[in-house]
């Protein structure tokens, strides 16, 4: 088992054998290698005929050194596939597995071993000195906005100014005190807002200004009611109410 048949020729091929093998494949095509020795009369085994054709006699085979792109591709494929030369050669058109293997062993194996040694040394240095290349990084943290004492005092002391309209300009039966309020704010400077002040503490003015207190001196006009005021009577009435409250 496993022994070659007796009388088969081994070793290098002659030019006559190459011509016979080429003529047979041109006539019958590739494949059916067990019939090639019978058709050609060669004293060779089918495996020897197949390898001779695929590695040397096939017209599409490229000869010469590998270019830079092919070398780069061989390095990448060898890193993935290892020593599977037939698979690597299948990715290189026109290159045989034997050519790729020979080129690797003669040119690339030493370089590959040197690169592996360098990477191992670098990894050892990194693991032995992990903190040697560490750098300090300054972190800037946000700070809260601070206000000066002057600004805080100015903000507290800002109050709206109220201008009260005199009594003789705004009195009628239904007393309404109109005033203008000016707000000194940054966004609403120099703007007047007219509002109606209805304060419960000032409602006692209505009782002082009614017609039954002032008597028949009130005269009606087309615009409204005008009241001649007697301030002495008003203040006397005010004193009486304060005494009653006390």
Curated annotation (Swiss-Prot):
CDD domains: SANT. GO terms for biological process: regulation of anthocyanin biosynthetic process; regulation of DNA-templated transcription. InterPro entries: Homeodomain-like_sf, Myb_dom, Myb_TF_plants, SANT/Myb. GO terms for molecular function: DNA binding; DNA-binding transcription factor activity. Gene3D superfamilies: Homeodomain-like. Its main location: nucleus. Residues 5-61, 62-112 form the HTH myb-type domain. Keywords: Activator, Developmental protein, DNA-binding, Nucleus, Repeat, Transcription, Transcription regulation. Residues 33-57, 85-108 bind DNA. One of its GO terms (cellular component) is nucleus. It is found in: Nucleus. Transcription activator, when associated with BHLH002/EGL3/MYC146, BHLH012/MYC1, or BHLH042/TT8. Interacts with BHLH002/EGL3/MYC146, BHLH012/MYC1 and BHLH042/TT8. This is Transcription factor MYB113. It comes from Arabidopsis thaliana.
């Amino acid at each position: 088992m496993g022994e070659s048949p007796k009388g088969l020729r081994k070793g290098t091929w002659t030019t006559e054998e190459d011509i016979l093998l080429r003529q047979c494949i041109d006539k019958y095509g590739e494949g059916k290698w067990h019939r090639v020795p019978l058709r050609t009369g060669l004293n060779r085994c089918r495996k020897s005929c197949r390898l001779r054709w695929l590695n040397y006699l096939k017209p599409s085979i490229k000869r010469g050194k590998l270019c830079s792109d092919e070398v780069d591709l061989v390095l990448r494929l060898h890193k993935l596939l290892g020593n599977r030369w037939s698979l690597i050669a299948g990715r290189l058109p026109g290159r045989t597995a034997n050519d790729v293997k020979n080129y690797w062993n003669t040119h690339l194996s030493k370089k590959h071993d040197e690169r592996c040694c360098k990477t191992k040394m670098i990894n050892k240095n990194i693991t032995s000195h992990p903190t040697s290349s560490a750098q300090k990084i300054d972190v800037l943290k946000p700070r809260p906005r601070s206000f000066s004492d002057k600004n805080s005092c100015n903000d507290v002391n800002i109050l709206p100014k109220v201008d009260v309209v005199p009594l003789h300009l705004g009195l009628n039966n239904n007393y309404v005190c109109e005033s203008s309020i000016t707000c000194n704010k940054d966004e609403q400077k120099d703007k007047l807002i007219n509002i109606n002040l209805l304060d419960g503490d000032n409602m006692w003015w209505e009782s002082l200004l009614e017609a039954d207190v002032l008597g028949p001196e009130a005269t009606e006009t087309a615009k409204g009611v005008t009241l001649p005021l007697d301030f002495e009577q008003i203040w006397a009435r005010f004193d009486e109410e304060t005494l009653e409250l006390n």
